[in-house]
Amino acid sequence: MGRELQKKKNRSGNAKIKLKPKSKRVNPLGNAIIAANWRQEETLTQNYRRLGLTSRLNTVTGGIEKKKAGPESKTSTANKLAISNTIPKSLAPTEARVERDPETGKIIRVIHDEKKTNPLNDPLDSEAEDGEGEGFEGFGDEEGSASKNEIVKMLEEQASRAGEKRERQQSEREKEWIERLVKRWGENYGAMVRDRRLNPMQQTESDIKRRVQKWKDAGGSVTTEA
């Protein structure tokens, strides 16, 4: 019988409703600095490019928005380290010295320029790595300026500030539970552990001792009935 009902449901014309998971929705306005400089008329990629940020670290695989003709953004740091997968269509000619055998005239070897070739335009295989005493000084812009975007500076300063760590406070129910334990067993923490009625969650001796000490430091004491 159950199988027939299942077949009937599968043949039904009523479409199954699937809810979109809210956990996958990204809130780009969670940061106050980004929210203050956000433009609603622009897309997420356009806003990130203008703010000097990037939404992904991998190289672009397709579906890139075509930019208008003109100078590129000087504050964007997106895809600066992405390695291009395309091979240049035209290679510039280079000069080299040829050594020949003085007797036969055959080419013995070809000596190229000391400049290291980089046909794939790999930024990790550039001349800057061969120089001595040179370090990474940031992305900069096309004009060679090392000045960073002000928004990026504000975000870096915000990230460098360590957040204040708040100590966990004991709830009223936890205080009442500790008070009942201390009222019954005093300082006998071993008996507190073995008490199945007052310790149903089987807290360890060290855990109960730490909670009791914290409760006493906060001014907790056993109340006596008159």
Curated annotation (Swiss-Prot):
Biased composition (Polar residues): 73-88
Bias (Basic and acidic residues) ranges: 96-117, 150-177, 206-217
Entry keyword annotation includes rRNA processing: yes
Ranges of biased composition (kind: Acidic residues): 124-144
InterPro entries named among the record's database cross-references: Ribosome_biogenesis_Nop16
Family under the similarity heading: Belongs to the NOP16 family.
Name of the protein this chain belongs to: Nucleolar protein 16
Source organism: Sclerotinia sclerotiorum (strain ATCC 18683 / 1980 / Ss-1)
Gene symbol of the encoding locus: nop16
